[in-house]
Amino acid sequence: MATERHYSPLDRLLLQADTAMRTLLPFSGQPARPSPAIIQPDADLDEQQSRHIAGLMRINHTGEVCAQALYQGQALTAKLPEVRKAMEHAAEEEIDHLAWCEQRIRQLNSHPSVLNPLFYGMSFGIGALAGLVSDKVSLGFVAATEHQVCKHLDEHLEQIPHEDEKSRAILEQMRIDEEQHAESALEAGGYRFPAPVRFGMSLLAKVMTKSTYRI
């Protein structure tokens, strides 16, 4: 019968460093699922459309970088083993989103945001602090963050032309996954943040979206 491996604090720190490198280095994230865009036809996009869609996908890619860092920070400080496992599992699913977004950005002849290391560090710190407060707050932060991501995805789906079926397929699958992450966090006992806290989080999200759209 297999036994669960127990990691020392140093082991976990090294694993976190490895995850950070795989998140931030180009082409280093290996998705477990193929991109939904693979089976979709190419669209005849003009230069302005391609540039705008690339900007939106860059925002989504950075959002996934932040989510990955958030989950890793929370997993590092989670008090209950089952909560830590849930965070690590969610982080694994976010790798798919990271890879899909990067692939699409490259197809549009653009690049991920140069600000990703900054946002990774900030999000990791926030996640670790939330985990130190309590698992309930940590899970609640996941739910609130994922709901914010879903809102961004909805806004982007409204802006992306219907003929760009590749980008739309990616965002639609991401939305399904993110909504599931949010609901799972609440079902696991996550705290439902009040409106003022959610509003503050939305303001921080706007800083990220405005800055990463172009760089």
Curated annotation (Swiss-Prot):
Q: What does this protein do?
A: Catalyzes the hydroxylation of 2-nonaprenyl-3-methyl-6-methoxy-1,4-benzoquinol during ubiquinone biosynthesis.
| One Gene Ontology cellular component | plasma membrane
Name the chemical reaction catalysed here: a 5-methoxy-2-methyl-3-(all-trans-polyprenyl)benzene-1,4-diol + AH2 + O2 = a 3-demethylubiquinol + A + H2O
Please give the chief subcellular localization of this protein: membrane
Q: Which CDD domains match?
A: DMQH
A Pfam family that the UniProt record links to this protein: COQ7
Q: Give the Gene Ontology MF terms in alphabetical order.
A: 3-demethoxyubiquinol 3-hydroxylase activity; metal ion binding
Q: Which family is it part of? A: Belongs to the COQ7 family.
Domain of life (superkingdom): Bacteria
Which pathway does the database say it acts in? Cofactor biosynthesis; ubiquinone biosynthesis
- State the organism of origin: Pseudomonas putida (strain GB-1)
Q: Which Gene3D superfamilies does UniProt cross-reference here? A: 1.20.1260.10
Q: How is the cofactor bound?
A: Binds 2 iron ions per subunit.
- Gene name linked to the record: coq7
Q: Name one GO biological process term.
A: ubiquinone biosynthetic process
Task: Return the EC number.
Answer: 1.14.99.60
Listed binding positions for Fe cation 2 are E94, E146, E178, H181
Question: Cross-referenced NCBIfam families, in alphabetical order?
Answer: DMQ_monoox_COQ7
Which cofactor names does the annotation list? Fe cation
Alphabetically sorted, this entry's keywords are: Cell membrane, Iron, Membrane, Metal-binding, Monooxygenase, Oxidoreductase, Ubiquinone biosynthesis
Q: Where does Fe cation 1 bind?
A: E64, E94, H97, E178
The membrane topology term of the UniProt record is: Peripheral membrane protein
Task: Give its localization.
Answer: Cell membrane
HAMAP family given in the database record = COQ7 (MF_01658)
State what protein this is by name.
3-demethoxyubiquinol 3-hydroxylase
